[in-house]
Amino acid sequence: MVSFCGVAACLLTVAGHLAQAQFPPKPEGVTVLESKFGSGARITYKEPGLCETTEGVKSYAGYVHLPPGTLRDFGVEQDYPINTFFWFFEARKDPENAPLGIWMNGGPGSSSMFGMMTENGPCFVNADSNSTRLNPHSWNNEVNMLYIDQPVQVGLSYDTLANFTRNLVTDEITKLKPGEPIPEQNATFLVGTYASRNMNTTAHGTRHAAMALWHFAQVWFQEFPGYHPRNNKISIATESYGGRYGPAFTAFFEEQNQKIKNGTWKGHEGTMHVLHLDTLMIVNGCIDRLVQWPAYPQMAYNNTYSIEAVNASIHAGMLDALYRDGGCRDKINHCRSLSSVFDPENLGINSTVNDVCKDAETFCSNDVRDPYLKFSGRNYYDIGQLDPSPFPAPFYMAWLNQPHVQAALGVPLNWTQSNDVVSTAFRAIGDYPRPGWLENLAYLLENGIKVSLVYGDRDYACNWFGGELSSLGINYTDTHEFHNAGYAGIQINSSYIGGQVRQYGNLSFARVYEAGHEVPSYQPETALQIFHRSLFNKDIATGTKDTSSRMDGGKFYGTSGPADSFGFKNKPPPQHVHFCHILDTSTCTKEQIQSVENGTAAVRSWIIVDSNSTSLFPEVVGSGEPTPTPMPGGATTLSAHGFLYGVTLWAVIVVAVIELAM
């Protein structure tokens, strides 16, 4: 998982005149469709012809534009536009009869382009950050896939565009006043265009985000011309903070379906479309804080890889912080008791509730989870790897801001991986520890919607122990049967067992072997098989048994085997060969970052040239150690197509000055 890059850590030298030549082009060739319902909404899109290069398979990228006031039908004041970016890929096989899957990354504030480009999308970006190769395990093999950047201001989605200055040393970002001259850029001072970075013009919590996404879906599924299925089933797959997104969004959609069907929804004509929900898949999701917090001390100290990431004393301190009077557990219970009375819909409308819930999250994170980060030296998303880890490779970060990619997508701003303003808006209302997520999952199951929980067993961030506890914490009609189901091996092919699964009917919990936070990146075939089996009503264990109808005796299909899977042990993996990609400083050591700042680093295509990178990517960085040429102000250039080119585009990645459009 790529973290938000600290700007000072990303300090690079920029030649201002070169950077200005690389600004994203004004979008051209964009199709504009005004809503037929007169709501003021519209769709803009292009056929980019990128990433999915399989002959005959179409893709479309664009925006659903929602005007101010769209959310008023939910009693929410919204005085800003919501321009939500999407990228849709037809299924490679029989798209007319294929179901549709929606993919969203978490954060909150993370772009779904991360999942698309490194996990389950049609292509991967090569080490040159300028070309792609097809992914044979893409989730659009048999499913139409829709990737969405949400909530507004995430990734390529925006409210309004504005010009900013950015000081790379102090990390200060200042909005330029209208008519103010564009300042001259230098090595540590840049200008550019972003979404507004106004915390008041993004979603304040998961429930608020669900409302905006539902309106997006109403427009897209009724009016987007590139989607004409005979199969109207819609599934949602999400990851990480998607442990909240998935339950809340899907439950909200189903609640709206019920209101439309029974006539209690009084929205305008364009908001009467029933979304035929089929499956919710959560990949390494942080679902319920109260249930999952005990899993962090266990994962750090007693996991199936026999890795003691913290010592006994630190482990005891983590447990004490969790269970002592006034500790993490008590703070969350206090948050939930207040929110259930004063803010039952988790809209952030009560400042006392917000503060109490925010305080609970801060305490629990610092004292229960973060000792692992402070003392282990291991990766947050893969306990088997030491920090820094270069996996999944961040080559896509530069590719998404290549001028030809921006032009093909028709986007009016630069892409960013994570938005700290969005994350802050969620944290400000204490969205993390609030209640309701497991209840949402129970509601979905009671309404016939499948729930598939998938967890890589090397992740710490939202680890599988917590995922298992969440699965057992869902209280619904078949809870007893699910608890009594044993674990069965996940048969991927004739020679490979990909993990263990407990399943009864529409609910499954899968532990995937040898996988970190982003399961499809680590185990692409296993992830694809689980995805297909979930959507096509097959058992997760073998893919051969029907799960949609009752068997003899009136029971649904259920797995049998051991009551838990802890007894299935793993060996720690070898370490990845390390390389530093300067657009993602989480892949770099402190010394490497300093070498970029002080001008001693040699860099090609955003990769620091050393013995590791020359062995991994000789066609990109060269096969031997180069002789760097100093550049004024710091970094070094290898050639006109080496570091200098990288610096020019990084200016575009961080910021850009463009004509404000759409």
Curated annotation (Swiss-Prot):
Keyword Lipoprotein tagged: yes
Record's bilayer topology term: Lipid-anchor; GPI-anchor
Coiled coil: none
PROSITE patterns hit by this protein: CARBOXYPEPT_SER_SER
UniProt signal peptide: 1-21
Lipid-conjugated positions (GPI-anchor amidated glycine): G633
Keyword Cell membrane among record annotations: yes
The EC number(s) this enzyme carries: 3.4.16.6
Residues of this chain annotated as glycosylated in UniProt: N130, N163, N186, N200, N262, N302, N311, N350, N414, N475, N493, N506, N598, N612
Pfam families per record: Peptidase_S10 (PF00450)
Annotated substrate binding sites: C462, E518
Gene Ontology CC entries for this record: fungal-type vacuole; plasma membrane; side of membrane
GO molecular function: serine-type carboxypeptidase activity
Broad enzyme group: hydrolase
An example Gene Ontology biological process: proteolysis
Transmembrane segments: none
Cleaved propeptide residues: 634-662
Disulfide feature: C51-C123, C328-C364, C335-C357
Principal localisation: membrane
Record's note on what induces expression: Expression is strongly increased during growth on protein-rich medium.
Alphabetic keyword roster: Carboxypeptidase, Cell membrane, Disulfide bond, Glycoprotein, GPI-anchor, Hydrolase, Lipoprotein, Membrane, Protease, Signal, Virulence
Subcellular location: Cell membrane
InterPro entries: AB_hydrolase_fold, Peptidase_S10, Ser_caboxypep_ser_AS
Catalysis performed (reactions): Preferential release of a C-terminal arginine or lysine residue
Family: Belongs to the peptidase S10 family.
Name of this chain's protein: Carboxypeptidase S1 homolog B
Native organism: Trichophyton rubrum
